[in-house]
Amino acid sequence: MIKKLFLLVRSLVILSIMLYLGNLIAYYIPSGVPGSIWGLLLLFLGLTTRVIHLNWIYLGASLLIRFMAVLFVPVSVGIIKYSDLLIEQINILLVPNIVSTCVTLLVIGFLGHYLYQMQSFTHKRKKVIKRRENQVKQAN
């Protein structure tokens, strides 16, 4: 019981430190990127470089994910509270969202097509090289 409590506190402390560091970066680098996103990037870098082990944050992260719906209730209430303002500004909000979605889909589509062709080309090139090596061996 005490060990599980220690693991939970440790994971929440690590997640809180990442959030704090992200907010610190957002304060000193005014790029418009929120501190929570910077914190997620720091957490991602820590996990990929294995500075932070997954089992260190697993318990706290799973607890937060379990109650994620409850954490989004204030956002939903804010949307309902200011729905008249959102309806007034629908053109300003809707057009950029549609354009950015279309641009994202196009970029992902072209990138996926390009990467698929590169993989296919690499496979074909390896087959040609192997065939030429076999022809050289047979000629000798």
UniProtKB/Swiss-Prot annotation:
Residue ranges of the TM segments: 1-21, 33-52, 60-80, 92-112
A UniProt-annotated Pfam family: LrgA
Coiled coil: none
Location of this chain's protein in the cell: Cell inner membrane
Keyword Cell membrane found: yes
Keyword set, alphabetical order: Cell inner membrane, Cell membrane, Membrane, Transmembrane, Transmembrane helix
GO terms under cellular component: plasma membrane
Membrane topology, as annotated: Multi-pass membrane protein
Family membership: Belongs to the UPF0299 family.
NCBIfam families for the chain: PRK01821.1 (NF002494)
Protein name, per record: UPF0299 membrane protein HI_1297
Protein species of origin: Haemophilus influenzae (strain ATCC 51907 / DSM 11121 / KW20 / Rd)
